[in-house]
Amino acid sequence: MEARDIALSAVLAALYAGLVVALAPISFYVFQVRVADALLPLSAVLGWPAVVGFTVGCFLGNLAGVLAGMPSGTVLIDATGGSFANFLGCYLAYRLASGSEDKKRLLASTFAITAVITAIVGTYLPLLLGLPLWMGWLGIFLGSFVSINIMGYLVLLAFLRARLRSFRGTP
């Protein structure tokens, strides 16, 4: 990775972790709307720097789970499992969209991220918290749908419009 890519990864990691910590009350447990996840679809167009940044950001942000009242014995598992889910989901989105600005491919990439996070986090989190598996899948899916498929897709479209304007030099 070039220095520019490393810097972008660091900025995205800090932004993701900062949002998780700042919005800790709604960023943890089975029923959550993790606003930081609205950034994940950017990996479809930003590529590896975003995949790495959101993976590291999730690990760091999830370590702060103790602040949200997560049992301390679950925090390291959540940090590892969540960052793996982010890595896999963001990588899959990047591969599906392949840097394309085609709206169908971009939308499909948001569903891929949601599916991966629901499958991984929705499976281990209820087991850690002693809840039924269906509750984990439902809760994580609903929160991810809101944060990734709705908010994240809108963030992605806004990013693409802003990037297009900056290259054209128009306001």
Residue map of PLM features:
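Hydrophobic transmembrane alpha-helices
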Residues: 1-49, 56
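Membrane-embedded alpha-helical hairpins and interfacial helices in multi-pass inner-membrane proteins
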Residues: 21-31, 35, 59-171
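Interfacial helix-start motif at the membrane-water boundary
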Residues: 44-54, 70-78
